[in-house]
Amino acid sequence: MEHAAPLAVPLGQAEVFQALQRLHMTIFSQSVSPCGKFLAAGNNYGQIAIFSLSAALSSEAKEESKKPVVVFHAHDGPVYSMVSTDRHLLSAGDGEVKGWLWAEILKKGCKELWRRQPPYRTSLEVPEINALLLVPKENSLILAGGDCQLHSMDLETGAFTRALRGHTDYIHCLALRERSPEVLSGGEDGAVRLWDLRIAKEVQTIEVYKHEECSRPHNGRWIGCLATDSDWMVCGGGPALTLWHLRSSTPTTVFPIRAPQKHVTFYQDLILSAGQGCCVNHWQLSGELKAQVPGSSPGLLSLSLNQQPAAPECKVLTASGNSCRVDVFTNLGYRAFSLSF
């Protein structure tokens, strides 16, 4: 039996541990800073890394520019979701949401500003919080996940003001219809539910898997991603990625992709989606696949569009998932480079 040649420089235990961590890393969530120049990425080890987009995109960028400017331990379990307000980074893990001041994070001071736990039915419950959604009109935050409820939190007082119940299994994703304001939620039960926040009630239910053109029983009924644009919604997961007219609850376009999709977003006249497989898919609303742009991860879980007006030079699409890398697309048509934990 042949033996591998010994390494010239023996790696210390810490280096071996870090290499193994990177090998098995999943980046679940991303959020752009209010100034548009930094990107936060949260992984399965409870770490949040802050990358400088402005440094990585600079003409003088070096390899070091693609590494985090700071990494800190935020949660005991995975960082499933993150959003940013004009001052704060909010992160969600198992059973709680935490608030961090962007200004302090960037000074490399990583103390949480506050933490909140939604009122769960039993003290033994520690369900994951899969999705966070800001509702600017009422200065609130919606949290949803493993306890099958949507919890609304007042961002000024930190108080939980209501719980919306209707899902029969855990919730994967949230989206906002701003004009109303109404919130859409998608879950493991195969339903997309529409909630009117003014009356705190469910006003519409679409059971996607019951529509023959969308149903894919071999993949299950779960809804893993959704996005909305006025009267239109796109959602996918177990069922096919499909564009819906909300007012009539009608599926209008079924997108021809077999792999379950984990993230979807409207962008200009396109729909961008990603999931199993390394590609970011660009769809016309008609269902035509305009482009498939490969990235460096074998599967994608999160897409983030940096459209902060304060930093037009940092206008990029970033994609992350089953690796330690965040792919950066400066032009939607190709991957320019990758940031790495």
Swiss-Prot record:
Belongs to the WD repeat THOC6 family. Keywords: Apoptosis, Developmental protein, mRNA processing, mRNA splicing, mRNA transport, Nucleus, Phosphoprotein, Repeat, RNA-binding, Transport, WD repeat. GO terms for biological process: apoptotic process; central nervous system development; mRNA export from nucleus; mRNA processing; RNA splicing. GO terms for cellular component: chromosome, telomeric region; nuclear speck; nucleus; THO complex part of transcription export complex. This is THO complex subunit 6 homolog. It is found in: Nucleus; Nucleus speckle. The keyword GTP-binding does not apply. GO terms for molecular function: RNA binding. The lineage of its organism: Eukaryota, Metazoa, Chordata, Craniata, Vertebrata. It comes from the Eukaryota. The modification Phosphoserine is found at residue 180. Component of the THO subcomplex, which is composed of THOC1, THOC2, THOC3, THOC5, THOC6 and THOC7. The THO subcomplex interacts with DDX39B to form the THO-DDX39B complex which multimerizes into a 28-subunit tetrameric assembly. Component of the transcription/export (TREX) complex at least composed of ALYREF/THOC4, DDX39B, SARNP/CIP29, CHTOP and the THO subcomplex; in the complex interacts with THOC5; together with THOC5 and THOC7, plays a key structural role in the oligomerization of the THO-DDX39B complex. TREX seems to have a dynamic structure involving ATP-dependent remodeling. Component of the THO subcomplex of the TREX complex which is thought to couple mRNA transcription, processing and nuclear export, and which specifically associates with spliced mRNA and not with unspliced pre-mRNA. Plays a key structural role in the oligomerization of the THO-DDX39B complex. WD repeats lie at residues 22-61, 74-112, 124-165, 166-205, 215-254, 256-293, 295-339.
